[in-house]
Swiss-Prot record:
It comes from Burkholderia thailandensis (strain ATCC 700388 / DSM 13276 / CCUG 48851 / CIP 106301 / E264). Coiled coil: none annotated. This is Uracil phosphoribosyltransferase. The gene is upp. PANTHER family: ADENINE PHOSPHORIBOSYLTRANSFERASE (PTHR32315), URACIL PHOSPHORIBOSYLTRANSFERASE, CHLOROPLASTIC (PTHR32315:SF4). It catalyses: UMP + diphosphate = 5-phospho-alpha-D-ribose 1-diphosphate + uracil. Binds 1 Mg(2+) ion per subunit. The magnesium is bound as Mg-PRPP. It is an enzyme of class 2 (transferase). Catalyzes the conversion of uracil and 5-phospho-alpha-D-ribose 1-diphosphate (PRPP) to UMP and diphosphate. Keywords: Allosteric enzyme, Glycosyltransferase, GTP-binding, Magnesium, Nucleotide-binding, Transferase.
């Protein structure tokens, strides 16, 4: 895991397996089926990385030989909240890793001026719960920042929120950081820039279209 000096709350997950799978996802010739499988696999790997600092407590268990105090994750079950629609493809990998997690949804689409328009919010109970928001791309950063706003307006502090994405543009990370410096953003790659249409370059195309086999 590495950082970029420009963005204190950005963490780049540079594990070789993550980078290998991301390269295949970038390939325009990768099929919908393979893209979907890779998204699940890469999210599972990234989820493993970002949960390494979860709080731990102990539980008394009896092995076939003795009783011991063994480590377990402390507190309430985590919540996974994909940002619709492409974020749904990431929830499968996270649920494979954390099958007991609660699941919410935040629906946001990007208007013509690239600003987020919210159309759905469904969340589990919020008190004392750690949230993992997920969306494959942080382009302009407005949708990601808005999704965090949804949680914070309901009383979730920034230190209990993580945001997981595959690729991000520096412009979007700056918007994210300015809005929520207390929230950690985890990505597989910090890409070069946004083009004139606010697409990430080099990026991986429209993640939602590639995941669901639709045309923009």
């Amino acid at each position: 895991m590495k950082q970029d000096s420009r963005f204190p709350n950005l963490f780049i997950l540079d594990h070789p397996l993550i980078q290998h799978k991301l390269t295949h996802m970038r390939d325009k010739d990768t099929s919908t089926r393979t893209f979907r499988e890779l998204l699940r696999e890469i999210t599972l790997l990234m989820g493993y990385e970002i949960t390494r600092n979860l709080p731990i407590t102990t539980k008394r268990v009896e092995t076939p030989l003795v009783e011991i105090d063994a480590p377990v994750i402390a507190g309430k079950k985590l919540a996974i909240v994909p940002v619709l629609r492409a974020g749904v493809g990431m929830s499968d990998g996270l649920l494979e890793l954390i099958p007991s997690a609660r699941v919410g949804h935040i629906g946001v689409y990007r208007a013509d001026d690239h600003r987020p328009v919210e159309y759905l919010v469904r969340l589990p109970d919020l008190e004392d719960r750690i949230f993992i928001l997920c969306d494959p791309m942080v382009a302009t950063g407005y949708s990601a920042a808005h999704a965090i706003d949804v949680l914070k307006r309901r009383g979730v502090p920034g230190e209990r929120i993580m945001f997981l994405a595959l690729v991000a543009a520096p412009e979007g990370v700056q918007v994210f950081q300015d809005a929520h410096p207390d929230v950690k953003l985890y990505v597989a790659s910090l890409d070069s820039h946004l083009d004139d249409h606010a697409y990430i370059v080099p990026g991986l195309g429209d993640a939602g279209d590639r995941l669901f086999g639709t045309k923009n």
